[in-house]
Swiss-Prot record:
Keywords: Electron transport, Membrane, Mitochondrion, Mitochondrion inner membrane, NAD, Respiratory chain, Translocase, Transmembrane, Transmembrane helix, Transport, Ubiquinone
Protein name: NADH-ubiquinone oxidoreductase chain 4L
GO cellular component: mitochondrial inner membrane; respiratory chain complex I
Subunit structure: Core subunit of respiratory chain NADH dehydrogenase (Complex I) which is composed of 45 different subunits.
Root EC class: translocase
Length: 98
C-alpha cells in the first residue's frame, strides 16, 4: 500500500473520529462529514486512475454531486436551527419532529 493511500485513509479515519468525538455542534459535524467525503473522493479518483478503470471514471463525480447535496441540506438545516433556537447544538434537532 503506497503512502498516498495511507495518508488518504488516515484523513478519512481522522474525520470519522472527529465526527464521533465532536458531535455536540452541528457545524463541526458537517465539517467532519465534508472531510470524509473529500477523502473518499480522492481515494476513489486515485484508485481509478491507478487501475486504469475507464468505465468507473464517473463514480467520483457522482460522489461529489451527493456531497454537494448533503452540504446544501446540512447548511440549510444549520441556518434553520440557528435562527430558531439561537444555537447550533445537535440536541436541538430532535425538537424539529412534528
Amino acid at each position: 500500500m503506497s503512502m498516498v493511500y495511507i495518508n488518504i485513509f488516515l484523513a478519512f479515519i481522522m474525520s470519522l473520529m472527529g465526527l464521533l468525538m465532536y458531535r455536540s455542534h452541528l457545524m463541526s459535524s458537517l465539517l467532519c462529514l465534508e472531510g470524509m467525503m473529500l477523502s473518499l473522493f480522492i481515494m476513489m479518483a486515485v484508485a481509478i486512475l491507478n487501475n486504469h478503470l475507464t468505465l468507473a471514471s464517473m463514480t467520483p463525480i457522482i460522489l461529489l454531486v451527493f456531497a454537494a447535496c448533503e452540504a446544501a441540506l446540512g447548511l440549510s438545516l444549520l441556518v434553520m436551527v440557528s435562527n430558531t433556537y439561537g444555537t447550533d447544538y445537535v440536541q436541538n434537532l430532535n425538537l424539529l419532529q412534528c
